[in-house]
Amino acid sequence: MKVSMSLILITLSALVTIAKAYDPSPLQDFCVAIDDPKNGVFVNGKFCKDPKQAKAEDFFSSGLNQAGITNNKVQSNVTTVNVDQIPGLNTLGISLVRIDYAPYGQNPPHTHPRATEILVLVEGTLYVGFVSSNQDNNRLFAKVLNPGDVFVFPIGMIHFQVNIGKTPAVAFAGLSSQNAGVITIADTVFGSTPPINPDILAQAFQLDVNVVKDLEAKFKN
């Protein structure tokens, strides 16, 4: 059965598009990031030091045994270990976070534009979930997690975690990017700089414009 050349080209184009949606694969053993452009080569958003000058400290970080401060409006804290903390992560397409939650605290709805996330709960009880895209009718996928449970948040999906217990909770998550990025929905929509016209948001969210103005005042940077 013959396969048309156009079908082959379409398939190859799709594969290239998918490949570009993630951090590119490294073409060397490692590429330790440095801030000095005079002595480095620019790769994947960072300058790389001479591999012969790399040392163990370039691949090391400490402190994830320490709880983050959760005394804030959402009662949670995210401690990030990405390429900015471990320069040796540059080009390796992976990073890590520790998330601490006060009782009833939450990691509010947000998205990672460049990474899938896999989360494991170490302590406490969490209610977690993500919402699929418009094409999938915005379905909610949610579970209650206990210690040792694992949940995956696909790349780009809006997701959240809420501590539903009376005691603190701790989770660790791996991300499929050296710098996953984060877009917190409420902060982004109601706290942008400059602010979005409240009339636009009032129509989009079907709210009174004064409610929108109040929300923008709360989330103003």
Curated annotation (Swiss-Prot):
Q: Which UniProt keywords apply?
A: Apoplast, Disulfide bond, Glycoprotein, Manganese, Metal-binding, Secreted, Signal
GO terms assigned for molecular function? manganese ion binding
InterPro entries linked: Cupin_1, Germin, Germin_Mn-BS, RmlC-like_jellyroll, RmlC_Cupin_sf
Q: List the disulfide bonds.
A: C31-C48
- Name the predominant localization: secreted
Kindly state the subunit structure of this protein: Oligomer (believed to be a pentamer but probably hexamer).
This molecule's function is given as:
May play a role in plant defense. Probably has no oxalate oxidase activity even if the active site is conserved.
The identity of this protein, by name, is Germin-like protein subfamily 1 member 17
